[in-house]
Amino acid sequence: MVQRLSLIFTDHTALVDLTLDEMKEASIQWADRQNEVNSDFLPAFRKAVSKADDARGILKAFKALQSRVNKHVGDIDGVTAEGRDILKEHGITPEFIDEIRTDMQREVVSSLQIVARALADANPKSAAIVNRVIGDIEASEGMGALKLFLSRAFNPNGNILPGIIGEAKKYVSEEELEQLDQLLKRFSYNPQTRWQMNQRSMGSVHEKVLSAMNSAIANSSVSEEKALEWADSFITEEVEEARAGQNGGIDLRKELADIYRLTGGKISTLSKVVHHQGRAYANLNGVVAVNLNDENASALWHELGHHLEYSNPGLLEKARSFLKANVEGDKPSFVNIGGRGKPEWCFRSRLSNIYMAKVYPPASVSNTGKIRQKSPTISKTSATEVFSMALQLYHDKEAAAASLMNGDGLLELLLGVAKELNNAD
């Protein structure tokens, strides 16, 4: 808003036919008509505009107004609290999380006890190390502490525990060998996901996630009939041809309708869904490209999350606030997870998946017309992966479990925002 006004107000020919009083009156009328402008902000804006000596003074008033609006729409405390209450209604409580943590703790200890017993005679020194690790695991309190300890203990770089477990494999039964292999596979340090849970625990968590999200869909302000009608507009001949002769794959009509209902019908930027066998993507031209023959619709939900953000600029401010709240350390430390030719910038965060912390630096155009990417920043990122990763949780069992167990707050944010969007009418 302010960028556009700045261009107008600094172009001395654009407003040559308007008097200062006419500019003031038009500015106040415009602000009065904006739904996203809290009425509490308007008196100060009117006063600042009235006192302006020239167009630059009016622009200064607009900048102050936008700053207050951004701070207001970027507040996530209220919606996150709403989402937390919704999760509680579906059994996702601190007590439930602690049960999962205890189960996970017990499972790891049981596996390490196999190692300690196997090496008691063969290598007493290594057995003693394992017993100390067991003691530390049993003493850890809270999911965050357990996750952090396991990610460090099983890190093959600089820790001897994985090697000790490998040594113990020579002295165990086939059943115990399988148990140790699973232990190493799940907890050896992975910078993308950090740690994993067993299938039983993942299923237990995801069942409750689906319950909460399906309830939000069922209670939507958008009827199923209206949502299916919207979804039908994307079932083109191209889509039908891509699906011809294929068994299984995404039920595009149902998935789109569910997303539309969950978000209160507040997706306006999507104009086309195309079949694409490469990496899925969404863009500002209205496109979502995914493999429609995939058995899992998580990519479709992920990409629709971008259009949810595109369609509701206030959600970008909320996403920025969410990211700022999850910075690891005093200030963001950015890493490139892409390549030199096509960098993908993420910052080190407390989130369960590094991709959640991805930012999109704004671009600038040089005097020669070359597009250059500016330095990565959270405050000025032009888009995020926050709502994309949140919607993905509907079909991604592993990501959903890891996010909730890590205490990301991602699902709470989504459910709170979904309720707000559905109540907006």
Segments and roles (model prediction):
Residues V2-N38, L42-A48, L59-A64, G74, ...:
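Active-site-flanking segments in enzyme catalytic domains
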